[in-house]
């Protein structure tokens, strides 16, 4: 939840979810 993954998730889910990133406030974050 604190480290930005450099990916937005406004229109599509986080592709980076495979490495533990999750959508928060339209941006993908890790932890």
From Swiss-Prot:
Disulfide bond among keywords: yes
InterPro entries registered for this protein in UniProt: Cyclotide, Cyclotide_bracelet_CS, Cyclotide_sf
Disulfide topology: 5-21, 9-23, 14-28
BP-aspect Gene Ontology terms: defense response
UniProt modification remark: This is a cyclic peptide.
Top-level taxon in the UniProt lineage: Eukaryota
Keywords for the protein's UniProt record, in alphabetical order: Disulfide bond, Plant defense
Pfam families: Cyclotide
Coiled coil stretches, renumbered: none
Covalent link location (Cyclopeptide (Gly-Asn)): 1-31
Domain notes: The presence of a 'disulfide through disulfide knot' structurally defines this protein as a knottin.
Summary of the function given for this chain in its UniProt record: Probably participates in a plant defense mechanism.
Family membership noted in the UniProt record: Belongs to the cyclotide family. Bracelet subfamily.
Protein name: Cyclotide mden-J
């Amino acid at each position: 939840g604190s480290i930005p993954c450099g990916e937005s998730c406004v229109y599509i889910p986080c592709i980076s979810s495979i490495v533990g990133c999750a959508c928060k406030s339209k941006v993908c974050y890790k932890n």
